[in-house]
């Protein structure tokens, strides 16, 4: 199987829509592909946060938590892009991430 470029995976994530039946497995597969085959960097953040903006109430049956855990497992400074995303459209998981980030920052001081 040919490994795809990061921008191809991100484009598919950006265009993802769950099936009419509410099947999110396609996004789950895309996120797995992104985390396992590429070096996630700052360029990925806007696309990943746009998923939260498009689905602000997280109806993904837990799939979008993969974005939360994946980003939090990196050493990326994601606070600014997260705040920008929340300014465009507040989202449940975006707010959770910001709260967790602020809590972690406060405890690290």
Residue ranges and their predicted role:
Residues 43, 62, 77, 92-93:
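Structural detector for tandem alpha-solenoid helical repeats, activating at a conserved register
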Residues 25-39, 62-73, 95-107:
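Structural detector for internal amphipathic alpha-helices that build alpha-solenoid repeat scaffolds
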Residues 18-29, 44, 53-57:
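HEAT-repeat alpha-solenoid elements in large eukaryotic scaffold proteins
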Residues 8-19, 30-33:
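Solvent-exposed, amphipathic alpha-helical segments
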Residues 14-15, 78, 89-108:
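Alpha-helical interaction scaffolds
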Residues 2-13, 40-53, 76-86, 107-109:
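Amphipathic alpha-helical scaffolding segments comprising HEAT/armadillo-like alpha-solenoid repeats
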Residues 17, 52-56, 71, 86, ...:
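Alpha-solenoid helical repeat architecture
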């Amino acid at each position: 199987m040919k490994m795809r470029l990061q921008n191809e995976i991100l484009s598919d994530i950006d265009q993802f829509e769950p099936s009419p039946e509410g099947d999110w497995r396609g996004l789950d597969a895309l996120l797995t592909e992104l985390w396992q085959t590429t070096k996630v960097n700052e360029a990925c953040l806007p696309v990943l946060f746009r998923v939260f903006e498009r689905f602000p109430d997280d109806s993904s049956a837990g799939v979008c938590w993969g974005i939360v855990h994946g980003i939090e497992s990196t050493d990326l400074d994601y606070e600014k892009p997260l705040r920008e995303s929340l300014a465009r459209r507040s989202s449940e998981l975006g707010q959770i991430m910001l709260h967790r980030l602020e809590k972690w920052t406060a405890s690290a001081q």
